[in-house]
A protein has these predicted regions:
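N-terminal loops that bind phosphate or other acidic moieties
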Residues: 1-196
Length: 196
C-alpha cells in the first residue's frame, strides 16, 4: 500500500499540468505520507489520509479559492471522516465520499465566478472525482473503464465575455519547493513572491 501510494503521488507530480494538476499531486503526496508503513487501509485510514492530503494542498496554495479542486477535496475529506466514525469499512467510506465529491463538484459552478461565466465545473475537481471512482472500481475488483465521453458536455462554452477582460498576468508559473527541514517557515518566501 505504501509503495502504491508513493508511486501514485510521484506519477501525479511528474504528470501535473497547471494549478489543478499540481494541487492534485500535493493532495496525494499528503495522502501517501499518511499511509506510510501501512500494508492495508480501512475506511478510517482512508479518511485520515485524505484529510492529510487536503491539509497539505491548502498549505501549499498561497491564495486558496473556493469552487476548485480544493473545495471538492475538503468537503470529501470531511465526509470521509464522518462516514469512518460510523463505519470503518473502506468500501462504504469510499462510496459515500464519492457521492459527496460529486455534489461538491456540481456546486463548483456556483462558487467560482469564472466557472459560472463559462458554465462548467472545475476540471481539477472532476479529475479528483475520477481518481476516487477509479480507486473504488479497483477495490471492488472491477476494471477501470476509460471513457470516451465522461458525461454531458456543452457544445461550446461561451468565452466571448473573457476577451474583454484585462489580463494582469499572461502566464501562470508553478513551482514546487521541497523543504529539507520540515521546520523551515516558507511564509517569508510567500510574502516576497506575492509582492513581485
Amino acid at each position: 500500500l505504501t509503495k502504491a501510494a508513493d508511486m501514485t503521488a510521484s506519477a501525479l507530480l511528474r504528470g501535473a499540468r497547471g494549478n489543478s494538476g499540481v494541487i492534485l499531486s500535493l493532495l496525494f503526496r499528503g495522502f501517501s505520507k499518511s499511509l506510510k508503513g501501512k500494508l492495508e487501509a480501512n475506511g478510517k485510514d482512508f479518511a485520515e489520509a485524505l484529510s492529510a492530503g487536503v491539509e497539505a494542498a491548502y498549505k501549499a496554495v498561497m491564495k486558496p479559492a473556493e469552487g476548485t479542486i480544493l473545495t471538492v477535496s475538503r468537503l470529501t475529506g470531511d465526509a470521509a471522516r464522518d462516514l469512518a466514525a460510523d463505519d470503518a469499512n473502506l468500501e462504504s467510506v469510499l462510496m459515500g465520499s464519492i457521492e459527496t465529491a460529486k455534489v461538491a463538484l456540481e456546486n463548483t459552478v456556483n462558487q467560482n465566478p469564472v466557472l459560472k461565466k463559462a458554465g462548467v465545473v472545475d476540471a481539477g475537481g472532476m479529475g479528483f472525482v475520477t481518481i476516487l471512482e477509479g480507486m473504488l472500481a479497483s477495490l471492488q475488483g472491477n476494471d477501470v473503464a476509460l471513457q470516451e465521453n465522461a458525461g454531458e458536455t456543452k457544445e461550446q462554452a461561451d468565452f466571448t465575455d473573457f476577451a474583454t477582460e484585462d489580463i494582469t498576468f499572461a502566464y501562470d508559473t508553478v513551482y514546487i519547493v521541497r523543504k529539507k527541514d520540515e521546520t523551515v517557515n516558507l511564509e517569508p518566501l510567500r510574502v516576497y513572491l506575492d509582492s513581485i
